[in-house]
């Protein structure tokens, strides 16, 4: 088994010529390699809808973890329920932070997402994912190379130094148009915020709509240097 500790540049070959640009092949390899020791960390963005549909074909009882920061859009929570109905066999876990919002306010002051967004992300996303990955050998992410400069070198199989794990990224070669084409073709549910200018959807407090021609992640932490929550730093 390929693990963080036994990592070497792997020579596993995945064909990119099929409809899924290698995604199904990558997922089939991952679930064969890691069996029950792999989890998909899903934010329920539009890429997530594609991956959930593909994962359901490969492993209908797969583990899916949603990092519930308690400050997501209501539309996101409603979408999760729709996904549960569409894919009832998937094991969707809504992972909570250890601190409630009130406890966080008492320890760090009100509106931590404004005063110290990095700490807020650490408490409400990074630490919960660390806990979720503690007993796993690998995790799946919906990163695409097209999304941003920080993601353009992502590979199918990555050694993840941040979480000392293997990170599997099946959608690296997909374009934004291809993601949506797949969603429409298979009549997949998606967050209606995508229809009103939100290409990337995170917490309600830190996500704004993006103007025409803007980068897909321009609405995340708008006005701040921050562009990532920290889950995908190496």
Curated annotation (Swiss-Prot):
<dbReference type="GO" id="GO:0070814">
    <property type="term" value="P:hydrogen sulfide biosynthetic process"/>
</dbReference>
<comment type="similarity">
    <text>Belongs to the PAPS reductase family. CysH subfamily.</text>
</comment>
<dbReference type="InterPro" id="IPR011798">
    <property type="entry name" value="APS_reductase"/>
</dbReference>
<dbReference type="GO" id="GO:0046872">
    <property type="term" value="F:metal ion binding"/>
</dbReference>
<dbReference type="GO" id="GO:0051539">
    <property type="term" value="F:4 iron, 4 sulfur cluster binding"/>
</dbReference>
<feature type="binding site">
    <location>
        <position position="120"/>
    </location>
    <ligand>
        <name>[4Fe-4S] cluster</name>
    </ligand>
</feature>
<comment type="function">
    <text>Catalyzes the formation of sulfite from adenosine 5'-phosphosulfate (APS) using thioredoxin as an electron donor.</text>
</comment>
<feature type="binding site">
    <location>
        <position position="121"/>
    </location>
    <ligand>
        <name>[4Fe-4S] cluster</name>
    </ligand>
</feature>
<dbReference type="GO" id="GO:0004604">
    <property type="term" value="F:phosphoadenylyl-sulfate reductase (thioredoxin) activity"/>
</dbReference>
<dbReference type="InterPro" id="IPR002500">
    <property type="entry name" value="PAPS_reduct_dom"/>
</dbReference>
<keyword id="KW-0408">Iron</keyword>
<feature type="binding site">
    <location>
        <position position="203"/>
    </location>
    <ligand>
        <name>[4Fe-4S] cluster</name>
    </ligand>
</feature>
<dbReference type="InterPro" id="IPR004511">
    <property type="entry name" value="PAPS/APS_Rdtase"/>
</dbReference>
<keyword id="KW-0963">Cytoplasm</keyword>
<comment type="pathway">
    <text>Sulfur metabolism; hydrogen sulfide biosynthesis; sulfite from sulfate.</text>
</comment>
<dbReference type="GO" id="GO:0005737">
    <property type="term" value="C:cytoplasm"/>
</dbReference>
<feature type="binding site">
    <location>
        <position position="206"/>
    </location>
    <ligand>
        <name>[4Fe-4S] cluster</name>
    </ligand>
</feature>
<protein>
    <recommendedName>
        <fullName>Adenosine 5'-phosphosulfate reductase</fullName>
        <ecNumber>1.8.4.10</ecNumber>
    </recommendedName>
</protein>
<dbReference type="GO" id="GO:0043866">
    <property type="term" value="F:adenylyl-sulfate reductase (thioredoxin) activity"/>
</dbReference>
<feature type="active site" description="Nucleophile; cysteine thiosulfonate intermediate">
    <location>
        <position position="229"/>
    </location>
</feature>
<keyword id="KW-0560">Oxidoreductase</keyword>
<keyword id="KW-0479">Metal-binding</keyword>
<dbReference type="Pfam" id="PF01507">
    <property type="entry name" value="PAPS_reduct"/>
</dbReference>
<dbReference type="GO" id="GO:0019344">
    <property type="term" value="P:cysteine biosynthetic process"/>
</dbReference>
<dbReference type="InterPro" id="IPR014729">
    <property type="entry name" value="Rossmann-like_a/b/a_fold"/>
</dbReference>
<keyword id="KW-0411">Iron-sulfur</keyword>
<dbReference type="GO" id="GO:0019379">
    <property type="term" value="P:sulfate assimilation, phosphoadenylyl sulfate reduction by phosphoadenylyl-sulfate reductase (thioredoxin)"/>
</dbReference>
């Amino acid at each position: 088994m390929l693990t963080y500790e036994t990592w070497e540049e792997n020579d596993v070959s995945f064909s990119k010529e099929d409809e899924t640009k290698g995604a199904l092949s990558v997922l089939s390899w991952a679930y064969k390699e890691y069996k029950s020791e792999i989890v998909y960390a899903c934010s329920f963005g539009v890429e997530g809808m594609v991956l959930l549909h593909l994962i359901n074909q490969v492993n209908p009882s797969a583990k899916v973890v949603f990092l519930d920061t308690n400050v997501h859009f209501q539309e996101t929570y409603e979408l999760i329920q729709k996904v549960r109905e569409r894919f009832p066999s998937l094991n969707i876990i809504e992972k909570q932070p250890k601190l409630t919002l009130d406890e966080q306010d008492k320890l760090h002051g009100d509106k931590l997402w404004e005063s110290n967004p990095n700490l807020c992300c650490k408490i409400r996303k990074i630490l919960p994912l660390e806990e979720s990955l503690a007993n796993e050998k690998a995790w799946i992410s919906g990163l695409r190379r097209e999304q941003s400069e920080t993601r353009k070198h992502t590979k199918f199989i990555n050694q993840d130094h941040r979480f000392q794990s293997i990170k599997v990224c099946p959608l690296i070669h997909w374009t934004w148009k291809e993601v949506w084409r797949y969603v429409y073709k298979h009549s997949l549910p998606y967050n209606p915020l995508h229809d009103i200018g939100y290409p990337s959807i995170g917490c309600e407090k830190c996500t704004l709509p993006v103007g025409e021609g803007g980068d897909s992640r321009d609405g995340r932490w708008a006005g701040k240097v921050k562009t990532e929550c920290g889950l995908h730093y190496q």
